[in-house]
A protein has these predicted regions:
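Conserved NTP-donor binding/palm subdomain of two-metal-ion nucleotidyltransferases/polymerases, i.e.
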Residues: 1-115, 121-380
């Protein structure tokens, strides 16, 4: 890894150890643009020495920060409003993902970009919650048909009529179609035992909400991230988990025991091992601890998955004719799966030719079109 890329890694480390002292930047214009594209632009004005940057780039970074501050504050205030209304009818929601971890562990909460706000409530509370959403000015909106949400882990998303803030009201952590769905750790009974009262507003403990326990948060974030390859926003899973491990006391025996289920172990291992091997953690987590996770990944699996993480998440490499965004996603899902290693190597070229999730994979016209794209076009 060259000096340019090592410097980029150091910037990521500064976030997860909450070091906001500016550093002399050797980042290229393109590298900074990639960080912005990856949704990390809001923190760069704090971390980079702007004396070496062009006025245009400084203006862009200032704009990223101001936009992130405004957008986060809007989401945050509307979350407080919803929690207040739910508390009035004796419902205490559980905060999930970005809204939970940003308000507790990020050096500045607006660093954590969020497309929507995720909360979890009991199944029998859904109807009451949806009445409150309508009262507060939200309406449900989705391009997917209603039957899709009958087995989904959250109801039809809610969008505010004027402020464009989205909420997802979860009844479970994963849909029935997910490999993570049957895991014991994600069952409602376990969540209810694990969750902890932790007010989102430390200055106003009259607002009551839960957060997942730290061990469950680590496994949930890793599993949600690992099920499919996400380039844009995918880095937040690494930052989220590194902040948990660097700033809280995690019960490793509990984490390892809970993670030792099919698929869950693979997702958790590959992310935690990447953090450890690249010195994202402050020493509280060791390779020996991570290696106790009973995953099914071979050396080749781990090598390929780590290359995908490094090249497409951290360095922002462009996709190519063969390794298109769709094909990288196919390879990711294959090599992180629980299939035997030799089968993965056999299936890899087959899946590239015949995409497993495509209804047209055996359609001749579709295949001819794909082959032309692979041979003659470059895809970002």
């Amino acid at each position: 890894m060259n000096a340019q890329n090592r410097q980029l890694y150091r910037l990521f480390r500064k976030i997860v150890v909450k070091d906001l002292n500016k550093t002399t930047t050797v980042l290229s214009h393109d590298t900074i643009l990639w960080a912005i594209h990856a949704r990390l632009g809001s923190c760069l004005i704090d971390l980079l020495d702007t004396t070496e940057l062009s006025s245009e780039l400084i203006s862009l970074l200032n704009s990223e920060e101001l936009t992130a501050k405004f957008w986060f504050q809007t989401q945050y205030q509307m979350t407080l409003e919803l929690i207040s209304e739910l508390n009035k009818i004796n419902i205490t929601p559980t905060l999930l993902k970005g809204i939970s971890i940003s308000t507790e562990l990020y050096p500045k909460a607006y660093y954590r970009a969020m497309c929507d706000v995720d909360i979890l409530v009991e199944e029998h509370e859904i109807e009451q919650v949806e009445k409150i959403m309508g009262k507060l000015g939200y309406e449900q909106s989705s391009l997917l048909p209603l039957p899709f949400y009958e087995t989904h882990h959250h109801t039809i998303p809610w969008q505010h009529k004027t402020k464009d803030v989205w909420f997802e009201i979860h009844r479970k952590l994963f849909p029935q179609s997910s490999p993570s769905y049957p895991a014991n750790i994600f069952q409602i009974e376990n969540i209810n035992r694990d969750k902890q009262l932790s007010p989102i507003d430390s200055k106003n403990d009259s607002l009551q909400n839960y957060r997942l326990g730290y061990e469950l948060q680590v496994i949930y974030i890793a599993s949600h991230w690992g099920e499919s390859f996400k380039q844009i926003g995918g880095l937040f899973a690494f930052i989220d988990i590194a902040l948990i491990l660097n700033n809280t006391t995690v019960k490793w025996d509990k984490l390892i025991k809970s993670a030792n289920e099919p698929y869950i172990a693979n997702y958790t291992y590959i992310l935690l091992s990447y953090l450890v091997n690249n010195d994202f953690l402050n020493g509280s987590t060791t390779k020996q601890q991570v290696n106790k996770i009973k995953h099914s990944l071979s050396f080749i699996d781990t090598f390929i998955l780590n290359k995908i993480i490094t090249n497409y998440l951290f360095l922002g490499d462009s996709y190519g004719r063969i390794l298109t965004i769709d094909n990288v996603s196919i390879l990711w899902e294959l090599f992180i799966s629980t299939k035997p290693a030799f089968k993965k190597l056999i299936l890899a070229p087959i899946y590239i030719i015949f995409p497993p999730h495509s209804a047209q994979k055996f359609n001749l016209d579709f295949q001819v079109s794909r082959i032309k794209n692979l041979l003659f076009k470059s895809s970002r």
